């Protein structure tokens, strides 16, 4: 069963104490608002509970949700807000199975799944859904509640080192396979992350501002289409913007890509996180549609760097450069799928994985 991120907007003051009580307790694995395995009525409660919780957050707590950090235990990590019982976001890379960062967790071993490009070659959507389900089950059992998959990039450059992570050069096949994998991932209390948005087709200069120049028709018919299908049919809780520039503007601060196309045209309801080290500004990025900077104060080489969404974002809000309403929107986009997919009520576990 796949839990869809709700699109309804319900007033926060309609929320009852029972509906938000898990938000007021520490999410430590011992207190649950529902029995293990039960699902929230996502059409009625997720948005309402998210809005109610948002009202209880300070500005500093809201900004804390909008950037991550590198944590030795999880690798990719957003710290919990214990005062309100908001659980940590513990992320694992996962285009071809869960990548475990902590050597103490199952010896960093998980099932090595076939390359996604091979999965797409089967044209088997039921298999793609099983693929996502298995990857997410192992992510959850190794302490993670966000799986950074699937990648629906169009594979057009044979030399691209990560082409195997995508589903090939066909937009329809990429979108439908990615949507099926997302349904499998999110049948667990795990957020799927559709990536890398957009026109991320080669590795050369990817961290040095490589610029993809593309006209409107090609952008919409080739590069946007797999994301459109994935958002419509897979309902991902998150999306990841890419390293590269598109028509001269970094993807993670590109107003046309993130606001006009992804959030307005495609009606994407989740949150946009940056690829790891793909944020280059504070005000331009948050106003351009980026909701969460990852991994915060570390570069892709795990060296300390500038965190644009840490102190600088708080300063920009206090200076009037970024409206509080934009911060609220970004936080709500994170909280809503967290509620809808059960992250507040079914904490990930550390369990041995079965071995053949």
List each model region and its residues.
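Glycoside hydrolase catalytic-domain context in secreted enzymes
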Residues: 10-356
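C-terminal segment of classical bacterial N-terminal signal peptides
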Residues: 2-9
